[in-house]
Amino acid sequence: MLDKRIMMADKQQNNYQLVRNNIDNIFSVSGAADCKTLEGVFASKVEAEKENTEALNKIIRVFRMAGCKESDVYSTASIYSHKLNPTAQTAEGCAQRAIKQEKYTEALAFYDEALQLEEIDSLKYDYAYAKAAILRQLGRYAEARSAAYQAISFNGKEGEPYILIATMYADSNPFGDDKILAKTVYWAAVDKLEKAKSVDPACSEAAQKLISAYRQHYPSKEDVFFKPELKPGTMFHIGGWMNEDVRCRD
């Protein structure tokens, strides 16, 4: 009899949890769940429940499902929850707040923490790519490339990390005053863009636009006359932080 009651209680608890999850899902994906509406509903609740991990995580879940991760309410709930019980999701929320405050070093630290706590590769990809984007903005290109490759290691079917690397290559000049050799970075950039197209058809259009633009800056035939080491078909090494071998081309 006791076992039967326990089984019935467990079943009721499971049913309750299922209903609650369904309510969260419906609310988050419905038209009523725009970010401003969610902020109006949950702003006061976050403060009232700032010591309640379960309540805070429920609020965080609703905001994530509604795509409202830039909301102040979301990041505030994340900060409170992170102090109580750090998770990858709360670390990301803390990173979002740091970014809005332009505290990029803090944001990078939170994304590192999220990467350590997360077990799902698709989410690890998001955190690593976010790191790469921040580092690129800070001009820390070598670190940004490392973070981009880290993102690729978690999801090799995404082209955005390759595009990010390409834009950094195109923005670099490891050759000082040598304006002809400086053009070779565009070969390296296009190589990454072609890779982006090959792994991710969804980014083909964006990659192709950059390819068309970068090709305009390739070394000309006249340039090659003065720099025979750039003869089409030969390999050329680009040093500095890039450290890439590229095939010379027209």
Locations of regions flagged by a protein language model:
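TPR/TPR-like (Sel1-like) alpha-helical repeat modules
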Residues: 1-8, 145, 149-153, 181-205, ...
